[in-house]
Amino acid sequence: MRVIILNGPMGVGKTVTGKFIAEKNPGTAFIDGDWCMDIHPFVGNRETKAMAVDNILHMIGNYQKCSECKMVVLVWLMDDPSVLRSVLDGLAALRAEVKSVTLICDRDTLIRRWKNDRGCEWRTDQWLEISLASLPRFASMKDAIDTSVLSVDQTADMIMGDQSQS
């Protein structure tokens, strides 16, 4: 099974890009890692992140058993390298074919996208500052793609290359 991982700061466009890829490729499941640790109030600590990784891998394992599912797109903010490593190790154990990409954009683009996404409960000024502060860390990742001047479909094409199923 093919698994596409989209990492990056909040507001960069992981969800919209992941959903676009899933919709354009029949037999693709979409997983938002946030669903896998949706505890109220939100707690992002070692224990809840480990639980989320376990939930993600369990879901992917189940999709792998389904003859209708050919690919999974996972979107999740993984700023802790050990979390990403745990996901990648788990996918290796599942013998998945993995492409991991970190989406980034410049500061002005992130602010614009943030302000245009009013439907998300996380789009507060406090979280925007946290997201902006994380840009340099994500930009330093070797798999980073700068989406500042790219549309969603251009970003998806860059991620998928010749792997698109449609």
Walk through the language-model features, giving the residues of each.
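Conserved lysine of the Walker
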Residues: 14
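Small-molecule kinase domains that catalyze NTP-dependent phosphoryl transfer to phosphate-bearing small molecules
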Residues: 116-158
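Walker A (P-loop) phosphate-binding loop of P-loop NTPases
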Residues: 11
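Conserved substrate/cofactor phosphate-moiety recognition/catalytic segment
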Residues: 18-61
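Conserved phosphate-donor/acceptor-positioning beta-strand/loop module used by diverse small-molecule
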Residues: 94-114
